[in-house]
């Protein structure tokens, strides 16, 4: 539902890409579920806000994806749900995403979700093979739950209670803190680059190869 539909001021169709732009001073309230198909880019500009109510879902299917610019935000207790791995289009957050669940599943060859801002979640769940969560900002989540074929590249700060993934790469000077580092039945790797730090305050299952750090 578009509770504040008149504030969605810009819809641009170019090169077969349909763009929904939430500009400064505008808010889009999702109270139930909204689904976007084919090639749709949702852009949250500086000062724009998407609010997803509890039990509501923003669904992005096929080649649909999101771009949150610095100063933009997606807030609420609801869900962002990506199917078909955005057909290879990169999802990008340089603002704030603070919601209940970020879920990536379905077919496709995986999706890159790039975080250069703040990503706060109750749960991150990824099951599409090849999906990579790349962090150059701050990620705080209660649960990070990826299967054997999903990956995390952390270049800055990440904190979670449960930490499960296929392959983890810790970039230079990066830090990750978890309460439980779980196994997932696959001997995937953890790569620690120079001056990176991975801290587990509780149970750690290291059925995997850990390389580094060398400095």
Could you describe each region identified by the protein language model?
Residues 1-215:
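Extracellular beta-strand-rich, repetitive "passenger/adhesive" scaffolds
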């Amino acid at each position: 539902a578009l509770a504040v539909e008149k504030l969605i001021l810009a819809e641009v169709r170019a090169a077969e890409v349909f763009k929904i732009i939430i500009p400064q001073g505008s808010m889009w309230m999702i109270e139930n579920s909204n689904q976007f198909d084919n090639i749709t880019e949702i852009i949250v500009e500086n000062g724009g806000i998407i609010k997803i109510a509890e039990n509501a879902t923003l669904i992005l299917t096929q080649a649909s994806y999101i771009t949150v610019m610095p100063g933009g935000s997606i807030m609420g207790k609801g869900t962002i749900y990506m199917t078909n791995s955005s057909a290879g289009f990169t999802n990008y957050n340089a603002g704030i995403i603070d919601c209940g669940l970020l879920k990536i599943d379905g077919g496709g060859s995986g999706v890159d979700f790039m975080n250069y801002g703040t990503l706060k979640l109750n749960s991150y769940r990824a099951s599409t093979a090849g999906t990579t969560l790349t962090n150059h900002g701050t990620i705080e989540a209660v649960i990070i739950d990826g299967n054997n074929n999903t990956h995390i590249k952390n270049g800055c700060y990440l904190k979670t209670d449960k930490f499960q993934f296929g392959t983890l790469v810790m970039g230079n000077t990066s830090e990750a803190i978890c309460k439980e580092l779980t196994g997932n039945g696959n001997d995937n790797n953890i790569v620690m680059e120079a001056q990176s730090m991975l801290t587990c305050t509780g149970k750690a299952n290291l059925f995997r190869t850990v390389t580094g750090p060398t400095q």
